[in-house]
Amino acid sequence: NKVTLQTSSGNQIVLENLDDKLIEIDDEILIKKESKKIVFDQKKGIKKLSYNTLTVPYGKRFDVELSDGSIVYLNSGSSLKFPVQFINGMERKVYLDGEAFFNISENNKDIFKVVSNDAITEVYGTQFNVKSYKEDSFSEIILVDGSLGVKGLSDNQEIVSLKPGFRANVNQSNEKIEIFKVNTKIYTSWIDGRVIFRDENIDSMILKLERLYNVIITNDNKKLSDNFFNATIVVEEESIDEVMGYLKEVYNIKYQKFNNKIVIK
C-alpha cells in the first residue's frame, strides 16, 4: 500500500520512502521529489518515447508534474502511465485508470490526450477532472476551464465538445456520451482534501469511502438503496470512524467495524 513509480526499464521506486531531493532514474533522467509530488524536467534531444507508471493505492494521494509543465493530481486507487519526456511535434498522450485532475500547460501544436478505460479526452491547455475506475459503469469528465473534446475508444466515434461547467458521462459498455451541467466544485474539491457528497446513493458513497480510507464496506441494509446522502469530509482531519459516526447520527445508519472492515446493518 505504497505510492510507487515504475520506470521505463521496469524498476519500481517506492516514493514514500524517499527524502525530498533530486533523484536520478533511468537514462540519467532527473526528477525532483517535493513531499507528495514528483517533478520531471524537460530534457532536450529525446527522440523516442518511454513510459513511467505512477500508482497511488487506496487511502493515499500523489501529484506529478510532467515534463511539459502540466500537473496531474492523482486520487486514491489510481494509476497514470505517462512519457518520461514529451517529444516536440508529437501528441502528448497519457493513460489513466482511476481519478485525476489535470492542469494542462498550453501548447497550440501538440494536443494532449488522456486515454481512460472507455474514453479519450483531447485538450490543448485546460483544467479538467477525469474519473474512470475499471469497476465503474461509466467515466466522468468534468471541465473546469478551457475547452476539450471527448470520444469513446472506438475509431468511428465522433468527438463531443465540452464547455466549462459541464460533465460528460461515457458509458463503458456502449460508449454513449451524455452531457450534464454541474457544480464543478463538487467533483474537484478532493484536490484540496475535501470530498463532497450531494444527493449521493449508498453504493456510490461506499465506493468512494473505500478508496479514500482503504477499508472494505459491506451494505447488508438494502433499504438504504432508496436514500440519498449529503456530507462534506475533510479527509486528513476526519477518520473513517468519525465519518461513520456522522452517518449514524444524521441518517441513523447502524454498523459494526472489524479492523478495516465495516458492515452496515
Residues of each region from the PLM?
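A residue-level detector for the "anchor" residue at the start of short, highly conserved motifs
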Residues: 1-265
